[in-house]
Amino acid sequence: MTYADELTEAMTWLGEKGDTIFLGQSVAYPGNAVYKTLSGVPMEKRVELPVAEELQLGASIGLALTGKTVISIFPRMDFLMCCMNQLVNHLDKGLYTGTGKVIIRVCVGSTKPMHPGLQHCGDYTEAFKKLLKNICVLKIDLENRASIFYQVAYKNPGSYLLVEYGDLYND
């Protein structure tokens, strides 16, 4: 099974759960490699958002407060930096109690076949691990089955930040 197949399987499994909703860019319309991995997720569970990262994560936290498990998709890790207020000062602090959770799905941009520019391929995984005290940060590489990581994130308490690698989508 390829990396992309693993991610598709994981998203399909999450899409079958009654409490899940998917938010982000290119979740309802094609635009990046992440879109194809949502093929098994019903359209009524997808909410397409503009490029407004702070809004996206704030809305994700709000939906989690209503009991939803929100899969908040950020196609590039570089742009996750735009919502550090929501991530660090709200979600990580656990200020709001509820029965839902936020699973952040973020991708380190692909550098193959050509380099996309410095703002599209940064890997800040280790920095996030040091910064976030209450959000579990996990790398999904070829050695780690994506479906297992997403099941762990869904079944266990707390919020998660799962890091994918664009260069592996075609492997």
Where are these regions (language model features)?
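Thiamine diphosphate
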Residues: M1-N170
